[in-house]
Amino acid sequence: MSNNDQLNEGRFFSELLKDANPRIKILFDVTNAYVTALNNNHSFEKYVSEYPFEKIECIHVSGFERDGKGTLRDTHSNSLNEEILISTEWMLQRVNPKYILIERDFNVRSIDDVLEDIYKLRGIVHKKKSIL
């Protein structure tokens, strides 16, 4: 198989779900897609463009870190980065998820840290609602 014949991640999921039970849905990890795209020199939008958006039922977001070499790491240890908020907003222009899941595993100093992420996401969701 040549590189041209290889499926990208979005096309892979499209092919996988094409003939699957229609009740099977996707939990889409915005941060993971963003980190993977940028670490492989792609734009987020191009990287996710072939996903079956109609199958996405849940959007998952978390913060990321940059290591000393500039490589992004999906660590769940920071508040939501501005890039993740922008990418989530882009996704919400194309997807109508039933759920949005925030994951924060480390560096939570207080409930206010978590509430800040919730408020940021709420603003994006309200913006989407006003467009509909």
Task: List the model feature ranges, each with a label.
Residues M1-G10, N32-E45, S110-D112:
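Active-site glycine- and acidic-residue-rich loops that bind
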Residues M1-K25:
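Active-site acidic/histidine proton-transfer and metal-coordination neighborhood
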Residues I26-F28, E57-V61, K98-E103:
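Hydrophobic faces of well-ordered beta-strands that scaffold small-molecule active sites
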Residues T36-N96:
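Gly/Pro-rich active-site loop or hairpin
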Residues R109-I131:
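C-terminal helical cap(s) of enzyme catalytic domains, especially alpha/beta-barrels
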